[in-house]
Amino acid sequence: MNPEKDFAPLTPNIVRALNDKLYEKRKVAALEIEKLVREFVAQNNTVQIKHVIQTLSQEFALSQHPHSRKGGLIGLAACSIALGKDSGLYLKELIEPVLTCFNDADSRLRYYACEALYNIVKVARGAVLPHFNVLFDGLSKLAADPDPNVKSGSELLDRLLKDIVTESNKFDLVGFIPLLRERIYSNNQYARQFIISWILVLESVPDINLLDYLPEILDGLFQILGDNGKEIRKMCEVVLGEFLKETKKSPSSVKFAEMANILVIHCQTTDDLIQLTAMCWLREFIQLAGRVMLPYSSGILTAVLPCLAYDDRKRNIKEVASVCNQSLMKLVTPEDDEPDEPRPVVQKQAGPSPEDCAAKQEGAASGGPDGSCDSSFSSGISVFTPASAERAPVTLHLDGIVQVLNCHLSDTAIGMMTRIAVLKWLYHLYIKTPRKMSRHTDSLFPVLLQTLSDESDEVILKDLEVLAEIASSPAGQTDDPGPLDGPDLRVSHSELQAPIPGRAGLLNTPGTKGLECSPSTPTMNSYFYKFMINLLKRFSSERKLLEVRGAFIIRQLCLLLHAESIFHSMADILLREEDLTFASTMVHTLNTILLTSTELFQLRNQLKDLKTPESRNLFCCLYRSWCHKPVTTVSLCFLTQNYRHAYDLIQKFGDLEVTVDFLTEVDKLVQLIECPIFTYLRLQLLDVKSNPYLIKALYGLLMLLPQSSAFQLLSHRLQCVPNPELLQTEDGLKAAPKSQKADSPSIDYAELLQHFERVQKKHLEVRHQRSGRGDHLDRRVVL
């Protein structure tokens, strides 16, 4: 510094002392400056006051010499003390050079800057608020200062500034928020602590409504919640908890929509605390905002669905996610199936909603995951409409939702509970919005069919519920069930088509009586037939599925849909099956289900009497496919009391190739005759004269069997058939002989028998072709 330079009104002694390396001498100079400035204040000499401040700022505080800078800082503090209440007029000039020194490399100088600014602020009090942003910016940097003395000094200044803000009603929150939003993303532990402490202070001031600006800082708060320091995490939890309480107190002023995606992001983090807190916030948002959250459904489901498969280690997160999922599902109503004209949000007045937590973006937790997150979920969702969203149109856009559900269902690595939740969502959407969902059925159908191979029975049950709803929904009704097949109506698996009402079945000739396909059931739509076709294709390509789960799947479908339609359509489709081995296996499975399942009691009764055209039509349809298995065909005739035709069929068995499998099936049929299902048949043995063909058919089976346990069983049963003369009563002698049950005139049994012969001939040809290929291969090996 040039000693000859004029620093008036500062005296040479003051200048010399300010530049001294000793603190005591600089302090003496500061007292002289204070005295000098007081005189200028008394004289109202603002020109000289400004000159003194400018000199101390430019020539000392911003000097290149460290001792000069220290002198300038203490001098500026002295000016502020001397100015007293008038210091507010000169705050910009007083504060700026001091803040510049906050960045000094010398830690002692940074400490003196803190001390100087403390004195300036202490004198000015509320007058410093217009300069709050620059003060906050400087303090936020010092909060992370490595020097403990500097940090201690900054904490004193920080407390003073907080006191001033708390007692003032002139704080410029609007101007401060951009700075807070920027600083909140600091990764420094101390800077984060500083930020959180200020948010806590601002939240506690009644005149400051920080909730309006929560969307600006919520993401940053969740970032801080993931800090490694326990103390900082706890502070952040407290802050988020306070915000959540305010949200529940004043939901009408909360900008739910602006924060929804923030929560969705943090619900997907790997940090348990962040995820739990974000999930708790999301739960409260869904319950408080109601349909306002619907546009964010796809994101919410992306975050929530994987959590439903968590184990007990993350039970809290799983429970809260489950409530979120249920609450969101309840927001979808039948009105959402109307044309895409946005509906205004309905505002409900509601009582206090259950206590909970908050969260967002990468992390998860805050708002007290301990107690508040465990609150019970009330069945009635309290819905408040935010002021900003009042009367705002809310339309349910299914594209994103269905895409998320489809993605999760297609992911084989996803947990069972998540898959079940996805299927529940799909079922709910098909129930509430069938018209809109029908547009997505083509994309969903393949993955729903694939899900039938799931390892979990519960998943398969839910999957079948969805498929059944698709198959029976009026929204999927079309007039064209599919293209016709070729002249013989036989196609490969990849070309299976839906049966066409009125068209003849496999090997059927024009004009054949009783062999027409029955009309489709009115309650079923085109997807029903597509479902049946693809289900059989799946059974054909995955024989393990048919073996392990086939009966289970078909029985459940009979409960969910119309059993007659299922058997009718499958029988029609099997007529077009080229793989005769699969057709035989499938017929055997269907016959076993028909004869043994309690779910089909009503259908068995319908077939037993053949009193209606529908039942006779069904019998003919089943018969044509049942012909793939001779013994099952006989069992169908027994079920429908067509004993004469059963006897005629058994007579044809002499022309068939009798194999071990064939005899095993006869054995099983004999065992089945002894079951409760055929109680009526056994009772009819008492009326020998009316049922001669039943007895002849049973004797025919007996003659087919070798001397086995089944032979003994049936033989003993037939031995119990009474002598008709012994049963003759006096009234019976007078009465005309009772004829057996008359064959239905609408069924051409001769044609049915011819059909049976044709099918069996086809089976024989296929077996011979296979054996021929086998012999040819054997000869090649020998050669």
Swiss-Prot record:
Keywords: Acetylation, Endoplasmic reticulum, Endosome, Membrane, Microsome, Phosphoprotein, Repeat. GO terms for cellular component: endoplasmic reticulum; endosome membrane; PAS complex. The keyword Acetylation applies. GO terms for biological process: phosphatidylinositol biosynthetic process. InterPro entries: ARM-like (IPR011989), ARM-type_fold (IPR016024), Vac14 (IPR026825), VAC14_Fig4p-bd (IPR021841). Residues 774-778 are annotated as: Mediates interaction with the PDZ domain of NOS1. The modification Phosphothreonine is found at T11. Belongs to the VAC14 family. This is Protein VAC14 homolog.
